[in-house]
C-alpha cells in the first residue's frame, strides 16, 4: 500500500531582486514530494539554493512563485507542524539539557509534570540519559546536536527539516550521529527532509535523494536508494552504496565542470 503524500513542493521559484535592478534566480520551478514516514535527502552544488528551499518549506522565507503543501494545506509561515534542526546547535546556554528539551512544550502550555516526562523520553531516545542537568557548555558538539534533535522531536512535528545538522562535527562523531538518526527514523516513523553536501551521508540515510542542479537550482534527478539491511557504517562498503554514490558524484562533477566552463 502506497504511503500518504505528506509534503509537496510545486513549481517553486525564488527570485532575489538585487542592486541596480538585477534579479538573481535562486530556485527555478522546483518540484519535490515526501511521503509519510519517508527519509528524503537533498544534495547539490554549493550555492544551488538548498538552504533557501528548506527555509521556504519551513516558513522562514517566501517563494516568488509556486507553493508548498503540507497534508494538502498551503504553507505560508513557520508552524509547530514542521520542526527544524540546523548546523548550529541553537540551544539556550543558560538552560540545562532537560530544560532545553522542555522549552517548546512549555511554550505550548503543557503542564510541568507532563513536559518533564515527555522530555525525558526524548532525552533517552537520543542517548543522553544522565546528562539532564548539564549545561550546553559542558557538552561536546555531538551531544549538543542530540539535544537539538530531542528538543525538536519532543514537539512532535509532522515533518522534521534538517539543514546540514552534522556538518560541523568531526568524521567519527558524524557517523555516530548518522546511525543514531537512522535508528530514530526507524523507531519513530518521523517524516524527514534532510539537506547535505556529503554524498556518503545522503546515500547512507536517504530512501530517496533529490539531486539539484547549480543555480538557478532545480531538480536534476530523483534517485531511489535500495540498501539491504539496516543502515549503519557497514553500509558504506556495499556494492549498492558505492554504485549510488558514484552516480551522484558523476552528476555533481558534470555540474561543476559545466559551471567552470561557463555553460
Model regions and ranges:
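The feature captures the beta-strand-to-loop junction immediately N-terminal to the Walker
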Residues: 43-45
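Conserved ABC ATPase "signature" region
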Residues: 102, 106, 113-130, 183
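Short coil-to-helix segment of the ABC ATPase nucleotide-binding domain corresponding to the Q-loop/switch region
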Residues: 95-103
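Hydrophobic anchor residue at the start of the ABC signature
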Residues: 149
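Conserved signature/switch motifs of ABC ATPase nucleotide-binding domains
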Residues: 134-137, 155
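Conserved ABC transporter NBD signature motif
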Residues: 66-78
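Catalytic Walker B motif of ABC-type/P-loop ATPase nucleotide-binding domains
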Residues: 160-163
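Helix-to-loop junction immediately C-terminal to a conserved catalytic motif
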Residues: 58
